Amino acid sequence: MNIMLKGFTKLLLLLLLVFTSFSLQAKPVDWRTTTFDNKEHFLKYMSACILDVNKKLPREQKVSDELVVATAVLESAWGTSRFALEGNNLYGIKTWTRTGPNMLPLENEKANFSVRVFLTKCDSVKEYVRILNNHPAHKDFRTKRLETKNALYLAPFLQNYSELGDEYTKRLVSVILYIRKHYDI
């Protein structure tokens, strides 16, 4: 009887382990429908996305997770901006052609540009990294990136991404330091 009880107990534990492992497995990220409940959720999403983007790139084209995330925080207000919510555009990436999906800025509907719409938020991350790797305005960034991956050192070389210049660098550094202090990414 005691042996039977031990066998039954082992079977129950095995079944419990199997069923709980199914329910505890991470759900795959649905890149298309993601909205963010809080800053931590935003950071986890961004970390998963940039990991996916960087693993497909040669070493010299990879971009620091912290820079990609901090820029998205600044440009999309933690993923809550209209462009992020309606257009999956975390970086305010503009277009001057109206051939593809795009959005007009509400405050300037007569602008000669529009903001790109992406299928997924992660697609906007891919495009941001592509811009950093190819646009002439970011040549200095690419040169310095070969020397270090330190986000705080590289942040000043992204000042051309915004019309704010040096002020943008200060904000970017501030966001990087805030994330380092409050979150583990």
State where each predicted segment sits.
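Bacterial N-terminal signal peptides that target proteins for export
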Residues: 2-12
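Bacterial N-terminal signal peptides
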Residues: 12-20
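Catalytic cores of secreted/periplasmic lytic hydrolases that degrade extracellular macromolecules
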Residues: 22-70, 74-185
